[in-house]
Design a protein with these regions (language model features):
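Composition-driven recognition of glycine/serine/threonine/acidic- and proline-rich low-complexity segments
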Residues: 1-155
Length: 155
């Protein structure tokens, strides 16, 4: 999969897929796609569907598969930026709720519960967040300006 992030306040990510490659996303993120992209919708099982409903996320996930070379574009739902992140062993990522935009099919999206009550009550993001694990490229939407910090172990 090759990609390019374009745009200003409401950016998009254009993904070029080879035959058989797949992308996952939650509802409402896809902007346009070539006719040879096939969409399937999955719930992920009753337990996962219940957990997603509890967290306020969509209970269903869309999977887009390329039947030959294809293109698909995903767009941000609010002003800000799109960031590409490589997910892999030791490179899992915890996101604020609703930050997940799209990912290659090898990336697993799940919910993450904060364990500290004070952080959940006063931290501004609540107790429920999103977790990306597995392996592949993921795209997250950042509301507002993106500032990056490189943290060391334990920070």
């Amino acid at each position: 999969m090759r990609y390019e992030i374009k745009g200003g306040s409401f950016p998009i990510v254009v993904c070029q897929l080879e035959s058989g490659e797949q992308m996952i996303t939650e509802k409402g993120s896809m902007v346009w796609m070539t006719p040879n992209m096939q969409m399937d919708t999955r719930g992920g099982g009753l337990g996962k569907m219940f957990a997603k409903a509890f967290s306020g996320e969509s209970m269903f996930q869309n999977i887009y598969a390329a039947r030959g070379q294809g293109m698909i574009t995903f767009g941000s739902s609010f002003p800000g930026q799109i960031k590409a992140v490589e997910i892999g062993p030791g490179r899992e990522m915890i996101l604020q709720k609703s930050a997940f935009l799209a990912a290659e099919a090898g990336v697993e999206l799940s919910i993450h519960f904060k364990k500290k009550i004070g952080v959940g009550l006063f931290g501004g993001e609540g107790f429920i967040m999103q977790k990306l694990s597995g392996r592949g490229m993921a795209f997250v939407e950042i509301d507002g300006e993106l500032v990056e910090y490189e943290l060391g172990p334990g920070e």
